[in-house]
From Swiss-Prot:
Region Disordered, annotated ranges: 20-89
Family affiliation: Belongs to the ERCC1/RAD10/SWI10 family.
Organism annotation: Saccharomyces cerevisiae (strain ATCC 204508 / S288c) (Baker's yeast)
PANTHER family on file: DNA EXCISION REPAIR PROTEIN ERCC-1 (PTHR12749:SF0), EXCISION REPAIR CROSS-COMPLEMENTING 1 ERCC1 (PTHR12749)
Compositionally biased intervals (Polar residues): 26-64
Keywords: DNA damage, DNA repair, DNA-binding, Endonuclease, Hydrolase, Nuclease, Nucleus
GO molecular function: damaged DNA binding; endonuclease activity; single-stranded DNA binding
Protein name, per record: DNA repair protein RAD10
Location within or outside the cell: Nucleus
Subunit structure and binding partners: Component of the nucleotide excision repair factor 1 (NEF1) complex consisting of RAD1, RAD10 and RAD14. Interacts with SAW1.
Role noted for this protein: Involved in nucleotide excision repair of DNA damaged with UV light, bulky adducts, or cross-linking agents. Along with RAD1 forms an endonuclease that specifically degrades single-stranded DNA.
GO BP annotations, alphabetical order: DNA amplification; double-strand break repair via single-strand annealing, removal of nonhomologous ends; meiotic mismatch repair; mitotic recombination; nucleotide-excision repair; nucleotide-excision repair, DNA damage recognition; removal of nonhomologous ends
Superkingdom of the source species: Eukaryota
Amino acid sequence: MNNTDPTSFESILAGVAKLRKEKSGADTTGSQSLEIDASKLQQQEPQTSRRINSNQVINAFNQQKPEEWTDSKATDDYNRKRPFRSTRPGKTVLVNTTQKENPLLNHLKSTNWRYVSSTGINMIYYDYLVRGRSVLFLTLTYHKLYVDYISRRMQPLSRNENNILIFIVDDNNSEDTLNDITKLCMFNGFTLLLAFNFEQAAKYIEYLNL
């Protein structure tokens, strides 16, 4: 110990103290830089989140609008309802002129209707046209006199499957005839509606035209 140079020992202590001081200073500087970086990240987070939100997919499920739609004009355009355009046929029933003497017409009191007739170019095969549906009319007594009449009337309309036959049961012993009429309707794409008087037959047309 007596041979140790005190100057050298003191210089070592001074060097150690200096290293400790530099180390502590470096830690302080590092913590400050970390705090600065953290504050910068906190300031940048809202901007980043806003960018993410603005890039979200807009669809019918989240019901969100882009930011450029926030002005009043764009919002009005977005909320404006489109005008409704009905594609349904008109409510006026078209009646073939061959039905002029049909008592059914006297009972069509709550439905608008007008006569139409066939021309050389435009042939009319229906008795009544209701909402785009072709309707044929037949009575049991007439069918017994002219059995082939209804099948000939159905033939040009059979390519469509939305046809209707209004059949008035105005005679007794109709079971066999009804079976035949039902088969004709099934094989020619007709819906069979049975009525027992002209007033009831007219009600069918009024209901179909609602």
